[in-house]
Swiss-Prot record:
It is a multi-pass membrane protein. HAMAP family: CbiM. This is Cobalt transport protein CbiM. Pathway: Cofactor biosynthesis; adenosylcobalamin biosynthesis. One of its GO terms (molecular function) is cobalt ion transmembrane transporter activity. Pfam families: CbiM. Its main location: membrane. Belongs to the CbiM family. One of its GO terms (cellular component) is ATP-binding cassette (ABC) transporter complex. Residues 1-28 form the signal peptide. Keywords: Cell membrane, Cobalamin biosynthesis, Cobalt, Cobalt transport, Ion transport, Membrane, Signal, Transmembrane, Transmembrane helix, Transport. One of its GO terms (biological process) is cobalamin biosynthetic process. It is found in: Cell membrane.
Amino acid sequence: MKLLKNKKVTFVALLAILAVLSTQSVSAMHIMEGYLPLFWCIFWFAVFLPFFVVGLMRIKKIVAEDPNSKTMLALSGAFIFILSSLKIPSVTGSSSHPTGVGLGTAMFGPSVISVLGTICLLFQALLLAHGGLTTLGANAFSMAVVGPFVGYFVYKFAKSIKLSTPVSIFICAVIADLATYATTSIQLGLVFPDANSGFVGSALKFMGVFLTTQIPIAIVEGLLTVVLYNLISENVKERAGLFK
């Protein structure tokens, strides 16, 4: 009981580290409404949509096989929503934030997160002015597709070389977070190429700006994800098998 209490305290403390850094006075990291030309809005929606459809099919199958999985799906979605809603200033007056996709990715795979992450992004755009509707496809592709798929690949690789589940989940969460920001940097670089160095130079500049704050954020997110995994595996033991 004491160990459980300590882990709950650790979870709250790590979440507080992120929350205390958050601010409402800066623009969000998600690409804002009206920031992308119409062509790129349509393009990213078209690229993202197949992943969303596959994700819906995957969720339907999971729930049909195990109706009790709805609880863990809801928990994964809530974790994404809470963490990705935090706004943390970066060096330019823009902001960075955790993504929260690592936990659900490890439990259900990346396809499911393409749906859960998109739902979170939609609510954030409507309720928090975080991101936008026209840029939903671009934001979903980076945070709900690329981040989870890269994180899942790394998670499976870590498990294949016999790393422990907590370590594998930590790596998954960190890499998924960083992959999301790398993708967003590429998206912005395509739209706003540098006058001298072109797309590559612009994308690298965006990455440099975001990574200044994103690396420590990703590490804290990884630790937070591991603590939540430990709470799940110790208190809902029948769900521990989800982390294969």
